[in-house]
Amino acid sequence: KGNEEEEIDRLRQFKHTITFLLGSAEMEGLVSYEHARKGITVLAEIIVRAAFDLSQKSLASRYGEVKDADGEPCNFAIVGLGKLGGEEMTYHSDLDLIFIHSGEGATTGPSVTGAQEYWIKIIQRLISCLSTITRTGFAYKLDTRLRPSGNAGVLVSPLDTYLNYHDSSEPWEHQALIKARVIGGSGSSEWFQQVKDVIHRAVYEWHPPSDLNARIDHLRQRKEKELSRESKHQRNIKEGRGGLLDVE
């Protein structure tokens, strides 16, 4: 456990160091704004993948591997959305993530559990690794609310369940996937392509309602009203009228 905590601290120190170097280089004019955004995004991907590996390592002695009925390793995908998915992170961006696995299976270690339960434990560990505040601060704040059914839904979804969900999901949920991008996980290139295909289908091959524009406009007005909290003397540059959300 002590070694695990040290690895988590090193991960955070690495993140803080590289972020400082990127910021310094941008201020000195050594890298452009666009290249800095790309660098911040790549750094986040590296940290997330390292935290995923560390989370699996920490549970390996208890659960072993997770395999399907044929004895093949179960696959997993970490999908970034928002600024992470669009490769346009800023220095204070949260990480919008969803998690997808290949389906049924069970662990091979002393403690036997199903694939769904195993992956949930892994992701709970990953979230703790990245967002819990310790003496070295925290790495990132994570937002997993864009998963199917939001906070009411399971943290990790089987691929077929994820696909079926988006056959009848809300327009804004399809919209949220426009920038979705696989950034990590475990499995073959074929597996990751399957995930990409499902996301592509959810974004570009669904049948939008006839009043799509009106519904998107209504959602934007609702967010503006509920989140911006603007007044004559106070403006919200991100969520207010004419702010960053409208620009994007």
Locate each region found by the language model.
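A nucleotide- and high-energy phosphate-metabolite-utilizing enzyme signature
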Residues: 1-248
